[in-house]
UniProtKB/Swiss-Prot annotation:
Residues 170-185, 194-205, 320-329 have a biased composition (Low complexity). Keywords: Coiled coil, Phosphoprotein. Residues 374-450 form a coiled coil. Disulfide bonds: none annotated. InterPro entries: Cfap97/Hemingway, Hmw/CFAP97. This is Cilia- and flagella-associated protein 97.
Amino acid sequence: MDQFGDILEGEVDHSFFDSDFEEGKKCETNSVFDKQNDDPKERIDKDTKNVNSNTGMQTTENYLTEKGNERNVKFPPEHPVENDVTQTVSSFSLPASSRSKKLCDVTTGLKIHVSIPNRIPKIVKEGEDDYYTDGEESSDDGKKYHVKSKSAKPSTNVKKSIRKKYCKVSSSSSSSLSSSSSGSGTDCLDAGSDSHLSDSSPSSKSSKKHVSGITLLSPKHKYKSGIKSTETQPSSTTPKCGHYPEESEDTVTDVSPLSTPDISPLQSFELGIANDQKVKIKKQENVSQEIYEDVEDLKNNSKYLKAAKKGKEKHEPDVSSKSSSVLDSSLDHRHKQKVLHDTMDLNHLLKAFLQLDKKGPQKHHFDQPSVAPGKNYSFTREEVRQIDRENQRLLKELSRQAEKPGSKSTIPRSADHPPKLYHSALNRQKEQQRIERENLALLKRLEAVKPTVGMKRSEQLMDYHRNMGYLNSSPLSRRARSTLGQYSPLRASRTSSATSGLSCRSERSAVDPSSGHPRRRPKPPNVRTAWL
């Protein structure tokens, strides 16, 4: 604090020198606030006027003007000019230590472009060299007068360059919303720097608030205002637009087609590709039609070409231009003829190949026997001819058999069926064949059977009555019955029409009373069973 106090005690009061600058700033701010309610078009034009007037004070050298123009392209033109003015004022009014702190705060708190701190220290060093001299008042007064006199000369050039840059920036902001949004971010940074540096000069607060209000517009408002200002430049009566009609026309032509399209660039690119593909497909479809149309054109124009050639031979020096056109047309027709002949040749070749594929094998077989050696020592010529005839006859028969579709289809079917059978099918076939063989054996046996003797009903009734007569007639009938019973069990068992009494007697006689088992006796030789 003691250091700052010592410096402030030896400091000269610059209120007299600052009063002129503050009065100029107040006049500018009053003019701005009086016309805030005007249209946005006029407001933007007035802002550009103020910018141009302030740049006249700023630019002291040609190098500095070029750097300022580059910075105006990167940022909107209203704000950096006022930043530079306020920084120069603060550099004159503050001591070295406070100035260095202020510059450090500005560079760290606000991310300003690199070109700003390179430009400010030059002005600061000039102020320091002239600040602590013997004639302080005269040096400061002369310096300000020198700055004003220098700024009066390049002001016109600066106005032109800034006007061009401003038009370019407005057109670029209207072309894409992304660039306008990035521009709005830089505007906010510049507005913050203005509000931070305005503590040293309180008279410039009102003008800076107005400028920051303009810069804090949304991207859409900027887009609209930029278009309106560029469109109304030719009709306005401001001296700047009147002095540069060519630039205003250029800006109108640049901005007029920048309305937002209905189709995105990717979709339009895809549509263009699709249209190109359609055109290619149509060209490919019309190739054959064009070829045949060219044939007709050649036929129709052949007479004209002949006449043109004759006329050319007669009037070569007189008709040079006509002959050149006829030559061009004849060359085109020759080229088309060549293409047509090539296509026709290809068609003929394809047809010939197809015919050879169909008829080639037969011709090949028939042509081979004709190619024979000139001399054959094993056979005479007559024998060789007979052999050739026989071979040709055999080849014809083989070719006929090969041409028949039935012969090819039947042979592989008979050969292919057995291996396709599965084991289950084979087992079924074997079982079926075995059953068929047994049935055939039984059928043969049944066919070989003959009717047995005495199996008729009349014969059995006669036997029954005869046996009954034997039993009733004599006492020795029991023996006879027993003997008859021994021979008659087979008959009684086989006849279903016999009576129950006879069957009971035959069964009793056949059963042994001691053992209870039937006694089997040898069969008579004349009796035969049906199943043997």
